[in-house]
């Protein structure tokens, strides 16, 4: 059991509203969150399966023997698919798994994922994280009460080099900029640790999406 309340503040729905962030109800727009996660996971895939065709097999282009007079079947090249060691016909080739995720879907999914973590009481606020030297031990002291058995995501406004290097040796801990965090990042970790300056960035990202959404809706009704 985590005992984070002594050193960190639990972010509740009411406190999120104090920052100007209104969280959606549970069950609303779950399909949007699903679509975004499928897109993020698909974009992380790389098609690596590949077979060599007769054009890519390393072999001589010389005709194995003359066309007539040998009594054997005619052959033009040793990389022919009918020969052992030749190319493969219609074999698997690398494919592009990437999906285009609309900006609106990204914004809604981020809001949904953040709301889910807040309602589950898995988001904690802490003061600005600063490191004057690279020390893993000091990084752990900032997260005092976190036993490390459950994965944790530290969201910072502008993580310094010392912070990144101090945290990369800690198992199950991820560090990401508030400007770059997405729904997959939030749901991929059990606990979320939010630096207070990062909350403002996160709220501004959501507000920006809401402004664009309202402008599009108003423009569409004219």
From Swiss-Prot:
SUPFAM superfamilies: Ribosomal protein L4. Keywords: Ribonucleoprotein, Ribosomal protein, RNA-binding, rRNA-binding. It comes from the Bacteria. GO terms for biological process: translation. One of its GO terms (molecular function) is structural constituent of ribosome. GO terms for cellular component: ribonucleoprotein complex; ribosome. The keyword RNA-binding applies. The keyword rRNA-binding applies. PANTHER family: 50S RIBOSOMAL PROTEIN L4 (PTHR10746), LARGE RIBOSOMAL SUBUNIT PROTEIN UL4M (PTHR10746:SF6). One of the primary rRNA binding proteins, this protein initially binds near the 5'-end of the 23S rRNA. It is important during the early stages of 50S assembly. It makes multiple contacts with different domains of the 23S rRNA in the assembled 50S subunit and ribosome. Part of the 50S ribosomal subunit. Belongs to the universal ribosomal protein uL4 family. This is Large ribosomal subunit protein uL4. It comes from Methylacidiphilum infernorum (isolate V4). The gene is rplD.
